[in-house]
């Protein structure tokens, strides 16, 4: 999922938010997920079958709206000889704008940033967006390690998918009943073998997780007994991986069952991670504002200038940012001017500063999308900040929804 851009994730989140707010009067909003290997002709046939079955809907208005939505889907399918590389997602339905009779047909058709896994046709009073949510979750990678003295399993968690990377066994001997010097000598052998096993686990953890360190959101460690604590407290893993440990869990099992147990026991921690990640970046930004380093910037103009210079390490965008970039072009002399307007503000009329001709709007783009594109061009990390935290609200209200953490001080 590392090839999925910040812009794509931002657009999916934005679309998700829009779709979740849509509600039909009855079970008349249609959602279709088409995997890339699915034949368009097969989908079109099923849509025609659904169109026929919809004649049995008792409510005249619901029947009419469902049939209209399916007909729109059938027409849109004709534009695709085959599904795009990652499949196709379609949301179609009549959305009420007020009282009865105010319904308007709304259509969303797009290729998701990650391949559609399962063909789905869904008709309800709300759009079926759960698979889209999983696409966003899939970008978030967690490392999971479960261990005791006898074995260890290393895995990754992406969304709801668990991938087992490595299973190791130790060969560490069990308890020995001999007494005296033999016992002490044997205990030393056991401790040395256990130490070597932890070193071996550490090497495999580094091999598995270091290539993912930029996208790795956290590491979960679990297992029965104290071995997991010895592993965490010792210098067995690379510091960049160690710094990402977010939870240590007592489990009853190792192996695959232990991995699932660690994940289940870490549910609350995982839920908190997005918020903690946002808080971390916002605190770094706020610290930069008041420190002598001066490694913080905010405001649309300043952040854009720093992005164009390649000086921004992390771009912070509020999910509540509601503005657009309007590009004006003079039809007489081709002079170009770009301004920012509020989301629902009527764009003003502009005259060319050179020839006084009325300029035409030739491009409209959300400010967030434009800044994210700039960020990707210069390899700047992007964090879309929610307004669910005090820091997120502060970014939105006090800093205009746009801020940056700089790579170096700009004079």
Curated annotation (Swiss-Prot):
Keyword Cytoplasm among record annotations: yes
Gene Ontology molecular functions: translation release factor activity, codon specific
SMART domains: eRF1_1
Pfam (any one): eRF1_1
Record localization: Cytoplasm
One GO cellular component term: cytoplasm
Superkingdom per UniProt: Archaea
Gene3D superfamilies named among the record's database cross-references: 1.20.5.170, 3.30.1330.30, eRF1 domain 1, eRF1 domain 2
Record keyword Protein biosynthesis present: yes
HAMAP family: Rel_fact_arch_1
PANTHER family membership: PEPTIDE CHAIN RELEASE FACTOR SUBUNIT 1 (PTHR10113)
Subunit structure: Heterodimer of two subunits, one of which binds GTP.
Family per similarity comment: Belongs to the eukaryotic release factor 1 family.
Function: Directs the termination of nascent peptide synthesis (translation) in response to the termination codons UAA, UAG and UGA.
Protein name: Peptide chain release factor subunit 1
